[in-house]
């Protein structure tokens, strides 16, 4: 009789106790359908090991184990000639994947804790926002937002500082300047003529454009990955590009440049990839929203996938409660992993090597979720 314990692995996809439970469930199924078959204990251990080798996360492991248990019941425990379990990944149904995706949807409390605007925020009365002093998000100086288009000096670092273990100090990634430096570049390696601000409260954001709750936008259940690019304008922080990708087919449903309401200060080309906006061609925000907030695209039944989606939904002025955020699914200690690092870690894929591309980012976040569930990234038929 084989020892009923999981095979040791260098990288465990799930805790020991969880793997033991799966082995016992497999054994129970085999004993039910093939009670006279020899060495069922060994087969249970072997088949669990096959599942573990295919899984890169606890959630993916549990999903793959559920498929194995389903197949044992479906095929009455019949074995192939080698006595091995061959995972039928292409046979995973759309309904099963949809159920697994729903298990990844974040609760309203988690959404609120991570900066998402929720229905509760919209219900609570907010104090009237008054125009006046704002803090520049780049140089951190106070300025009068009514003078935002008046040329001034804004000196800042393009990228945040990061701890350098070798130097044992914080260092700016954009220029290598040390955080405690007293040189002229200590305040920043770049200088522009305007301060910029970013409204963060529900009241401040609603003042420019009202939020719309997807509840009431009827439509069939769909799964969409999305990513936005933003620019700084005289009105704050606005949408300038939106990409929406369909989960099941990898089809790009929407990829448009969108006109901001305010006068453009900085398109953030280094990060947005947007070089110019032709107002004669680009859709206005309202024109774009008529398309992306609709029964055929983002509706009350949509599951939305993205990385740090609170920023995207804020500029889209959407309140939605079915969110899968890869930044929250894969925490990095007290911090959140960047999509660039996450794509390399989970997919061995390098992204954002040049200017950002919202379609590349949307697909990367979507593929991270597919990888988590053990779904082939190239599968397009269901």
Curated annotation (Swiss-Prot):
It comes from the Eukaryota. Residues 223-369 form the Exonuclease domain. The keyword Lipid metabolism does not apply. PANTHER family: RNA EXONUCLEASE 3 (PTHR12801:SF118), RNA EXONUCLEASE REXO1 / RECO3 FAMILY MEMBER-RELATED (PTHR12801). This is RNA exonuclease 3. 3' to 5' exoribonuclease required for proper 3' end maturation of MRP RNA and of the U5L snRNA. It is found in: Cytoplasm; Nucleus. One of its GO terms (cellular component) is nucleus. GO terms for molecular function: 3'-5'-RNA exonuclease activity; exonuclease activity; nucleic acid binding. It is an enzyme of class 3 (hydrolase). SUPFAM superfamilies: Ribonuclease H-like. Keywords: Cytoplasm, Exonuclease, Hydrolase, Nuclease, Nucleus, rRNA processing. The gene is REX3. Its EC number is 3.1.-.-. Belongs to the REXO1/REXO3 family. One of its GO terms (biological process) is U5 snRNA 3'-end processing.
């Amino acid at each position: 009789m084989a020892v009923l314990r999981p095979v040791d692995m260098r990288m465990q996809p799930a805790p020991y106790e969880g793997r033991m439970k799966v082995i016992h469930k497999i054994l129970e199924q085999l004993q039910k359908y093939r009670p006279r078959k020899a060495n069922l204990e060994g087969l249970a251990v072997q088949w669990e090991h096959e599942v573990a080798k295919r899984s890169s996360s606890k959630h993916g492991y549990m999903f793959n184990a559920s498929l194995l248990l389903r197949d044992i019941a479906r095929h009455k425990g019949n074995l192939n000639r080698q006595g091995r379990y061959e995972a039928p990944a292409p046979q995973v149904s759309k309904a099963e994947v949809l159920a697994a995706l729903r298990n990844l949807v974040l609760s309203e409390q988690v959404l609120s804790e991570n900066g998402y605007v929720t229905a509760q925020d919209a219900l609570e009365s907010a104090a009237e926002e008054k125009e006046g002093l704002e803090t520049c998000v780049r140089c951190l100086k106070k300025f009068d937002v009514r003078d935002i288009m008046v040329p001034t000096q804004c000196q800042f670092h393009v990228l945040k500082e990061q701890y350098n273990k070798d130097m044992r100090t914080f260092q700016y990634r954009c220029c290598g300047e040390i955080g405690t430096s007293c040189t002229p570049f200590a305040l920043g390696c770049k200088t522009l003529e305007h301060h910029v601000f970013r409204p963060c409260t529900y009241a401040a954001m609603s003042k420019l454009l009202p939020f719309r709750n997807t509840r009431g936008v009827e439509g069939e259940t769909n799964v969409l990955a999305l990513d936005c690019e933003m620019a700084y304008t005289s009105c704050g922080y606005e949408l300038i590009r939106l990409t929406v990708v369909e989960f099941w087919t990898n089809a790009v449903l929407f990829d448009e440049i969108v006109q901001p309401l305010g006068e453009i200060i900085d398109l953030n080309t280094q990060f947005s990839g947007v070089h110019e906006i032709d107002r004669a061609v680009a859709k206005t925000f309202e024109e774009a929203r008529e398309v992306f907030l609709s029964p055929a695209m983002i509706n009350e039944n949509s599951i939305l996938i993205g990385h740090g989606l609170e920023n995207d939904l804020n500029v889209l002025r959407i309140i939605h409660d079915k969110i899968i955020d890869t930044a929250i699914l894969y925490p990095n200690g007290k911090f959140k992993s960047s999509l660039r690092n996450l794509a390399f870690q989970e997919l061995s894929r390098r992204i954002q090597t040049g200017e950002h591309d919202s379609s590349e980012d949307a697909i990367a976040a979507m593929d991270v979720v597919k990888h988590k569930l053990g779904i082939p990234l190239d599968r397009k038929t269901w």
